[in-house]
């Protein structure tokens, strides 16, 4: 199960569609509150996480996931339009497993 937290509807729908049609099980969330509700029901195998989100930024979500024993080891890939070296270092220093700058190729 892959969870994608992305507020851009076009990106969220394209990525979840592509992952699902590649044989993976992906669910997209527009808002962090939707993501947290789903996390109470089922933990994913991977989280794709935008940084700039409504309600709560991606780095805050990342820190919360890493601080909780039940979610600390879930792989997290930050996906963001913020692509400076500083942004990438901040993401990795806060516990992301990798950082992918938008726009990106789904292949």
Kindly label every feature range from the protein language model:
Residues 50, 80:
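Active-site residues of response regulator receiver
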Residues 102:
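A Lys-centered signature of the CheY-like receiver
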Residues 43-45, 70-75:
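His-Asp phosphorelay/catalytic-motif detector in bacterial-type signaling
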Residues 54, 84:
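The feature encodes the CheY-like receiver
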Residues 8-27:
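Two-component/phosphorelay signaling modules centered on CheY-like receiver
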Residues 27-46:
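Acidic, metal-coordinating helix/loop segments flanking the phosphotransfer/catalytic sites
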């Amino acid at each position: 199960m892959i969870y994608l937290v992305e507020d851009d509807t076009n990106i969220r729908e394209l990525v979840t569609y592509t992952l699902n049609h590649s044989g993976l099980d992906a669910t997209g969330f527009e808002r962090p509150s939707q993501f947290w509700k789903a996390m109470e029901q089922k933990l994913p195998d991977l989280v794709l996480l935008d940084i700039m989100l409504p309600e709560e930024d991606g780095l805050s979500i990342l820190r919360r996931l890493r601080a909780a024993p039940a979610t600390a080891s879930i792989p997290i890939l930050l996906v963001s339009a913020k692509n400076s070296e500083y942004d990438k270092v901040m993401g990795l220093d806060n516990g992301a497993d990798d950082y992918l700058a938008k726009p990106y190729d789904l292949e």
